From Swiss-Prot:
Nucleotide-binding keyword on record: yes
Official protein name in the record: Coenzyme F(430) synthetase
Region (Disordered): 300-348
Known role: Involved in the biosynthesis of the unique nickel-containing tetrapyrrole coenzyme F430, the prosthetic group of methyl-coenzyme M reductase (MCR), which plays a key role in methanogenesis and anaerobic methane oxidation. Catalyzes the activation the g-propionate side chain of 15,17(3)-seco-F430-17(3)-acid (seco-F430) for intramolecular C-C bond formation to yield the carbocyclic F ring of coenzyme F430.
Source domain of life: Archaea
EC number annotated for this UniProt entry: 6.4.1.9
GO molecular function, one term: ATP binding
Biological process, per Gene Ontology: methanogenesis
The organism's taxonomic lineage, starting at the top: Archaea, Methanobacteriati, Methanobacteriota, Stenosarchaea group, Methanomicrobia
InterPro entries given in the database record: Mur-like_cat_sf, Mur_ligase_cen, MurCDEF_CellWall_CoF430Synth
Catalytic activity of the protein: 15,17(3)-seco-F430-17(3)-acid + ATP = coenzyme F430 + ADP + phosphate
Amino acid sequence: MDLYRKKFAVLDLTHGGIPIAKSLAAAGNEVSGIDVYRTVKPETLLELEEKYGIHCSKTPLPASGFDLIVAPVHLDPAYPMLLEARAQKKKVLSHHEIVGEILKGDSRLSSIKTVEVTGVKAKTSTASLLADMLSRQFEVVLHTSRGLECWKAGASSLIYKGLSITPGSILVAVEKTFEAGFRPDFFIFEISIGGTGTADLGILTTLSPDYGIANNTALASEAKLQLIKHAKSGSTLLINAGAEKALKAAKKDQVKVLTFRDPFNDQLSATSVQIADFVLETVPETSALSVPSELVMPSGLQKPAGLSGSSEPDSLSGSSTSAGLSDSSMPAGSTEFQASPTPSGSDIRFMRRGKKILSASLRPGYNVSAYRTAFVAASAAAIELGTKPEAIISAIEGFRGLSGRMQEKEMNGVSLIDNSNSGMDILSAEKALDYALLKRKDEKKEGIILVLGEESSQVCEGLPPELVQGFIEKFGAKCKQVILVGERMKAVNGKNISYARDLTEGLSKASEFAGGDDIILSSVKCFR
């Protein structure tokens, strides 16, 4: 697509429209930015006008004055400029599509492999685990809701913090990476509600639970199918086997389609269970980590130029070492890696088309069930991208959970279950409470202090107060105290309830209520 000397209207400067407008203006286009939600500060709009030559408006402009309209998939189709554009049969591009076109024109990306991860759940954990796995062999830059990070040899360093996961933020992530002097082998982007069509590997973690977007005129699952429908020819798609809508949409004659299955997902149909290429299983006892020699370096996607392609397994670092032993129970030609004992007693086994590729022992300190999708999706992606199984094992066995994603820790001597993140929703809060109740029973704890709510209604559609009210009515009695976070939560009523402005204040109040044998459960929707 020719992106030169066109008249663009970029709608929604709140959710990633600003970097899109800047990129289009820098390419020699005449750009107008529409602050649809009227949330952008006047000084920011003035800077866009004076420094970048972008005309800004807080009200709709006539669609007839533009060659192309750029709008996010979540924008209400009844917005005047979109209504006019459809009536005039004017082309409307999504933020995802225009970002894809901009990225295609960036020659700096030509030698870098790109992975995009989208879905309802497990995006951040899948992307983060994959970055860890790949970094054992390659240099990786990871962009998620946790920040922009460079990964090398299983360790990360922060490049930049404060970006959202809107498609427009990818443009900023790329610039910040190159400005910092990094030239990675892989970019991994967590992206909300779809894909840009430029990924070498696209990962769809889940499509459920589905929800309405664009003023409830469309489903988020349909928008996420952009990852599938716009996938570039020759790329690979890794899709949750339960996402049948996505499997039907995939152009299998143009892209390679692989599926993965979490066996604990009760939403899978019998048909879906049969077609999965990659499956995660639990192992009742600690077992040897076997890596069949023919699976040590799968072909998958072509590796970045200049990287070694040795198929010989290296000794594992961390909790696993190369034993070099044989066992009659293992398939011929296998190399056995013996797992060191771990106190968790929880093992997983990773299968490809019915054949075991690897198994690993998990560390304690986090809710393993919250990461099942991430374990199987990241492992499948890593195998497809040419990662050695022992690197995958090392990453899994060293994994301690992600902050805000069912990680267990202590705060002032009190047990804390941290479930506060941008993807937290009321269903996640229910599951977290179930887990906390089990932990209370198993560890003979006393009460549960629940911190629940939102830091801002702008965080991924926020947490609807009416759903929180229903949650309190149903589960509030199970908690010793409930601390509701956010201005909108003041409308929620119930027994043993107090209120806090933000997560920090909520946790501070929880510490005041909690005794040494209590559990604090933090489930607040926020950027972290």
